Amino acid sequence: MCIRDSSRNRTVIDVLYSTGCRVSELCDINISDIDLDEKYLKLKGKGSKQRIVPIGSMLYKNLLQYLNVRDTFLQNRGEPLFLSKSKNKLDRTAVFRIIKKTAKNISIQTDVHPHTLRHSAATHMLEGGCDLRTVQEFLGHSSVSTTQIYTKVTKEFLEEAFTESHPRS
């Protein structure tokens, strides 16, 4: 794998996890959707709804590195953020392959999909103390009941919450 592909793949995974975006939203990101000065990313969600998500420090670093590598390898600095080897917009199938290959390379035995990263982002935000309504906005859900489906509370988190908040713990 060349440096360009390695940087792209790392950034694809980071965008999926850091923003909790859907794979279709990832594929639709254009360079103009990124504001590195203000550190936010504009996503085009279901039903043509747009939402703004923050760019965290790790994603910021990976985006800068990827954009630098991308611009070095490509004469065409076209709009789509993620491009295939044939310089077309990266598609869903390619993203699934990137996730599967990366999981295999790091010896993850369970079945991993791009949506797994979305679920993980939501769960980790909740475990970190974020309220459900904020996670709903972050994920671009119109209903909080949809957000509840996406989240899993770990046994450890539940035990800790019980111990810290229940008077008879």
Residue ranges and their predicted role:
Residues 4-169:
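Conserved catalytic core of the tyrosine transesterase superfamily
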